[in-house]
């Protein structure tokens, strides 16, 4: 994510809102945000509403907003049910770069379909552990397999590894 100078704030949202589960609920998604640049109020430090993951319904997510000011290299981790969003970048020249990684429970469908979004040649260059982290694995003997096979073994066999 790279909000540039003059970027509007992102609307407050929850990253697990697309799962039809009553609230509050057990954590479904863990969000991580790694700051590549300093996060300041001026360049749009991420906004979070502490405790909002415990709400049964939206109350007023614009109350009690915490701004995650942090130094480059810092990591912010939060429950995907927490209301959050990127702040407005009111600077004239600063880009606020970050790497955002979301992890959901293994039995839930991920938000992005990386199986077709990442070229197979790129996947082939990844270590097996990273391939499994992307989702080339089974949850148990029934969920996530391909023709009753482990997806990583299936993928590797198709590419003669």
Per-region residue spans from a language model:
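Conserved double-stranded beta-helix
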Residues: 1-47, 59-77, 82, 87-161
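A short linear-motif detector with a strong N-terminal bias
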Residues: 10-14, 25-28, 55-56, 77-81, ...
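Active-site-proximal flexible loops/turns
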Residues: 20-22, 44, 57, 86, ...
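Short, solvent-exposed loop/turn segments at secondary-structure junctions
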Residues: 5-7, 17, 39-41, 53-54, ...
């Amino acid at each position: 994510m790279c909000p540039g100078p003059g970027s509007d704030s992102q609307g407050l949202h929850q990253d697990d809102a697309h799962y039809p589960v009553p609230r509050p609920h057990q954590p479904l998604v863990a969000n991580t945000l790694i700051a590549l640049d300093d996060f300041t109020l001026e360049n749009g430090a991420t906004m979070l509403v502490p405790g909002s993951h415990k709400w049964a319904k939206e109350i007023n997510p614009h109350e009690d907003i915490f701004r995650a000011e942090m130094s480059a290299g810092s990591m912010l981790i939060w429950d995907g049910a927490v209301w959050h969003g990127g702040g407005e970048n009111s600077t004239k020249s600063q880009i606020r770069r970050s790497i955002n990684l979301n992890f959901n429970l293994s039995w839930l469908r991920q938000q992005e379909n990386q199986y077709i979004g990442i070229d197979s040649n790129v996947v082939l260059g990844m270590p097996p552990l990273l391939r499994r982290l992307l989702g080339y694995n089974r949850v148990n003997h029934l969920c996530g397999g391909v023709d009753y096979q482990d997806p990583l073994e299936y993928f590797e066999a198709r590419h003669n590894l």
